[in-house]
A protein has these predicted regions:
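Intrinsically disordered, low-complexity Pro/Gly/Ser/Thr-rich segments with frequent PxxP/GP/PP motifs
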Residues: 80-113
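Terminal connector regions
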Residues: 107-134
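Short acidic, flexible loop segments centered on an aromatic residue
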Residues: 59-80
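Asparagine-centered strand-capping/turn motif at beta-strand->loop junctions
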Residues: 53-58
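Bacterial N-terminal signal peptides that target proteins for export
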Residues: 2-12
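Bacterial N-terminal signal peptides
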Residues: 10-20
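Hydrophobic core residues within well-ordered beta-strands of beta-rich domains
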Residues: 47-49, 66, 101
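Low-complexity, acidic Ser/Thr/Pro/Gly-rich terminal tails and inter-domain linkers that flank the onset
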Residues: 26-46, 52, 133-134
């Protein structure tokens, strides 16, 4: 009985030692993405982008820039305007963990039409953040 208890505690000791030596793969970090709610085409040459930064991570961070691929499609299915790699620099907006922060900005391009009819948009974004401001 004494030897089985010794083996058990030895095995438990090595299991705890290995667990402490190997770093956890689930480290705390921010996961921030920009989402678009609406695109408005009030004036020719300008698109108003209304959206939000969402942090689904477990640590807050500062947004530095977001890069967007945007396509605007008329109600009849015709592509009205498209561009990719539109980089918008942000002035250190802090996004706490598990929250949304509303954000609006403008894209200026001479090919953007003024349009008041129905249209939809397709987009993809890539957001860069850092843990420190500045």
């Amino acid at each position: 009985m004494k030897s089985s208890a010794t083996k058990f505690f030895t095995l438990l000791f090595f299991a705890l030692l290995i667990t402490a030596a190997i770093p956890s793969s689930a480290q705390a970090k921010p996961i921030i993405k920009f989402g678009i709610e609406h695109v408005y085409l009030h004036n020719a040459g300008e698109a108003e982008i209304v959206g939000y930064f969402e942090n689904t991570g477990d640590q807050g961070a500062y947004v530095k820039w977001t890069e967007i691929d945007l396509t605007i499609i008329a109600d009849n299915g015709q592509q009205m305007w498209a561009d990719s790699g539109i980089r918008h620099y942000v002035d250190d907006i802090y996004v706490p963990a598990g929250t949304y922060v509303a954000y609006t900005f403008y894209i200026q391009n001479p090919d953007i039409p003024e349009y008041h009819g129905k249209y939809r948009n397709r987009w993809h974004s890539n957001t860069h953040w850092e843990k420190a401001a500045g």
